[in-house]
Amino acid sequence: DKRVISSVSRCLNPYEEEGFKQMMDVAASDDLEIIVSNTTEAGIVYDPACKLEDVPASSFPGKLTQVLYHRYKAGKKGILMLACELIDNNGKELLKCVNQYIDQWGLDDGFRKYVNEDCTFCGSLVDRIVPGRIRDPKEVAELEQKHGYADPLLDVGEVFGVWVIEGDTK
């Protein structure tokens, strides 16, 4: 079955200067409400080599701290963070890493309060096999012909799936 996911407007590459700038523009947008992470179980790690001025920080929690700090400085409301990494207490572990960067980078107490009170870091359990994009160019071409457009984000996943989200009452 074909399902169009129209809530994804684009992909940004933060490792390119323009992509990093666009990521920070999104961070300061009123439209941003939810961030979903799926960086694999190795992605939620604190790397003391990350710096606030890195473009971008090398770790995912470092990048997230940069995004949240930019959002905070722009005066925008907190976000809902949905961590999907396959580790215990993924949301709490991600928040712990962000707080470590707040300490390491000497960011102000107002930002710490923003992260810990205005943002919500939810834990989650995800069970769905998503093998990834279709690698056969012929199959991709057939799908593009059938549906009438090219989709650079074309992906496949098993029919069964469950997403359990743990959070507070916010």
Stretches with model-predicted labels:
Residues 1-170:
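Substrate/ligand-engaging "lid" and interaction regions
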